[in-house]
């Protein structure tokens, strides 16, 4: 798949430089004392959340990352230069885990957030440090400390205000294409969307929100069926969910059973997902068969206190009312003018 949302990499901070063994050798000072300088500190590994990145593709292509080594100390009390830090710019929303223990090390959930992930090794002390009244000419120095290293797994979770949820081919891609600048691949067959698509939706009075078109889910998704649980995690950070249903296939397909099946998958993957607010959308209201079937499914949702918004992603019918509802949930109220 072209969207890289998970990658395993090896990172290493810089080794410290070695201390120097050196003695003053100057004219008229035949027995000069020790003047070996310290080694430089190794570079740190730093991770920073960048709002300008959206994938982990670069790290997939370069899975081994290493900070600079500290330079060795030199004579005349000259210390080695510090190793260059390795600054890894990552998309906002990247979660960094230890690849072996699965421990979460860093959650880069804010733009500009910067964390020192691995510290560089300390530089070794030169022999000038070890001169004493009992040993005025030490002939030894410290080696530099090795840097830290570990295998990491990076996961990128989409930072979206609204997530589009539903079985394959119910019209999620068509809706996000209609109301945002996103242009996902659209066709009338399952799993057209093979990656999460983000779209920025412009609302009234210059307000906007981010919508995520999540690939279609099927029963067993929490166990990896279909496109698998790798996409369920993209829903975890969305503030609200739009659950899109296609009732044009009744009675061959039961949209209410599909609705329950998807919510079951959410609960099995993460119980908190099933508790997120959902807006129920009936797509393709421009089709006569959908208008006929609408009366059959409405009581189901009315009994559960859920609002239903019939729309057409093809013609735009019903979309203004849907966006007003999203705005009410995001900001507490909808704007008066569309």
UniProtKB/Swiss-Prot annotation:
One Gene Ontology molecular-function label: GTPase activity
SUPFAM superfamilies listed in its UniProt record: Obg GTP-binding protein N-terminal domain, P-loop containing nucleoside triphosphate hydrolases
Keywords assigned by UniProt, alphabetized: Cytoplasm, GTP-binding, Hydrolase, Magnesium, Metal-binding, Nucleotide-binding
Class of the enzyme per the UniProt entry, highest EC level: hydrolase
Entry binding sites for GTP: 166-173, 191-195, 213-216, 283-286, 312-314
GO CC terms of this entry: cytoplasm
InterPro entries, A to Z: G_OBG, GTP-bd, GTP-bd_Obg/CgtA, GTP1-OBG_CS, GTP1_OBG_dom, GTP1_OBG_dom_sf, OBG_GTPase, P-loop_NTPase
Domain annotation OBG-type G: ranges: 160-331
E.C. designation(s): 3.6.5.-
Signal peptide: none
Keyword Repeat: no
Quaternary structure, from the entry: Monomer.
Role played: An essential GTPase which binds GTP, GDP and possibly (p)ppGpp with moderate affinity, with high nucleotide exchange rates and a fairly low GTP hydrolysis rate. Plays a role in control of the cell cycle, stress response, ribosome biogenesis and in those bacteria that undergo differentiation, in morphogenesis control.
Protein name: GTPase Obg
């Amino acid at each position: 798949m072209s969207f890289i949302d998970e990658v395993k990499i090896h990172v290493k901070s810089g080794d410290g430089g070695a201390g120097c063994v050196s003695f003053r050798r100057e004219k008229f000072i035949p027995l000069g004392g020790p003047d070996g300088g310290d080694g430089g500190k190794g570079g740190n590994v730093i991770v920073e959340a960048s709002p300008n990145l959206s994938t982990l593709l670069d790290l997939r292509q370069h899975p081994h990352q290493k900070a600079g080594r500290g330079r060795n100390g030199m004579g005349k009390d000259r210390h080695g230069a510090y190793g260059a830090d390795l600054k890894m710019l990552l998309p906002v929303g990247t979660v960094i885990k230890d690849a072996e223990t699965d421990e979460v090390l860093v959650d880069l959930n804010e733009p500009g957030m910067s964390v020192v992930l691995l510290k560089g090794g300390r530089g070794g002390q030169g022999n000038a440090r070890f001169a004493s009244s009992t040993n005025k000419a030490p002939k030894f120095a410290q080696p530099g400390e090795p840097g830290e290293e570990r295998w990491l797994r990076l996961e990128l979770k989409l930072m979206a205000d609204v997530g589009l949820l539903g079985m394959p081919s119910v019209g999620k891609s068509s809706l996000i294409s209609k109301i945002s600048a996103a242009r996902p691949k659209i066709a009338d067959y399952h799993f057209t969307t093979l990656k999460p698509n983000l779209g920025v939706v412009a609302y009234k009075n210059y307000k906007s929100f981010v919508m995520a078109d999540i690939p279609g889910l099927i029963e067993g998704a929490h166990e990896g069926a279909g496109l698998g649980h790798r996409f369920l995690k993209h829903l975890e950070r969305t503030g609200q969910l739009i659950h899109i249903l296609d009732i044009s296939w009744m009675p061959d397909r039961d949209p209410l059973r599909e609705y329950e099946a998807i919510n079951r998958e959410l609960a099995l993957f993460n119980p908190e997902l099933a508790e997120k607010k959902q807006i129920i959308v009936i797509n393709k209201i421009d089709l006569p068969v959908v208008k006929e079937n609408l009366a059959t499914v409405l009581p189901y949702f009315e009994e559960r206190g859920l609002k239903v918004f019939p729309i057409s992603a093809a013609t735009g019918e019903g979309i203004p009312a849907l966006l007003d509802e999203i705005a009410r949930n995001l900001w507490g109220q909808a704007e008066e003018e569309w």
